[in-house]
């Protein structure tokens, strides 16, 4: 295995371990602080999908987004953590979320879906988690149909000031946290700029404290 692939595999193993630790109490800690962004991203993705649209949720985790999505969608969720998906499945069963058609353990960087299978993809708080964001972006892009959209909700590191110093200090514990506090916007922005069929439709900061950013990226229809 090449060095880069080996490093990615090790990082992914650490991520799986981190979210196995988080799974039992993830919702208790991350539900309310992340809810405004989660709600905005879910609404943007649902609007893009339309009635009976096929939606992929990348990094679905414990499924906090699922109950925010309309019942007339056809939702598939993937996550690398089986422990997180166990919580999501229990949520779907308990709340009768009929829009959820499938929840699968899957590497977001190598998904078992056909090209253009989905109308829209929602990637909530996942790009600063995965070992190779560009690979996940490209793979998510592949499974969106031309004319579809990708909705990304994420934290991006501050350029300077006290918040940047805090993020730099927290980055030392990224292996334990399961995400990278010092995650630059360029990791996503440069990828968007490099795609000839991509258009950044919306970029909007959201509460709390404008810590999170919503991106809506359109995939141009083939001429």
Tell me what each language-model feature is.
Residues 215-223:
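C-terminal lobe and adjacent flexible extensions of AdoMet/dcAdoMet transferase-like proteins
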Residues 13, 153-208:
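C-terminal alpha-helical "lid/dimerization" subdomain adjacent to the S-adenosyl-L-methionine
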Residues 2-50, 64-65, 87, 91-95, ...:
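Conserved class I S-adenosyl-L-methionine
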Residues 54-110:
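Class I SAM-dependent methyltransferase SAM/SAH-binding core
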Residues 119-132:
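A short SAM/SAH-binding and catalytic strip from SAM-dependent methyltransferases
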Residues 109-121:
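A short acidic, Gly/Pro-enriched loop at the edge of an enzyme's catalytic core
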Residues 134-146:
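A short glycine-rich, Lys/Arg-flanked "PGG" loop and its adjoining helix->strand segment in the class I
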């Amino acid at each position: 295995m090449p060095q880069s692939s080996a490093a990615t595999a090790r990082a992914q193993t650490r991520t799986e371990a981190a979210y196995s630790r988080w799974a039992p109490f993830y919702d208790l800690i991350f539900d309310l602080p992340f809810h405004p962004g989660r709600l905005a991203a879910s609404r943007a993705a649902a609007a893009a999908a339309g009635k009976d649209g096929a939606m992929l949720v990348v990094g679905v985790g414990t499924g906090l987004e699922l109950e925010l999505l309309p019942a007339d969608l056809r939702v598939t969720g993937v996550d690398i953590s089986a422990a997180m998906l166990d919580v999501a499945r229990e949520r779907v069963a308990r709340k009768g979320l009929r829009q959820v058609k499938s929840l699968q353990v899957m590497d977001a960087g190598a998904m078992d879906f056909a090209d253009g299978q989905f109308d829209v993809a929602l990637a909530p708080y996942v790009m600063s988690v995965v070992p190779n964001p560009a690979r996940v972006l490209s793979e998510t892009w592949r499974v969106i149909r031309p004319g579809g959209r990708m909705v990304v909700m994420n934290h991006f590191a501050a350029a300077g000031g006290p918040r940047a110093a805090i993020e730099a200090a927290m980055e030392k514990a990224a292996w334990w946290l399961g995400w990278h506090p010092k995650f630059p916007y360029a990791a996503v922005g440069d990828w968007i700029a490099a795609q000839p069929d991509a258009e950044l439709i919306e970029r909007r900061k959201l509460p709390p404290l404008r810590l999170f950013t919503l991106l809506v990226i359109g995939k141009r229809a083939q001429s």
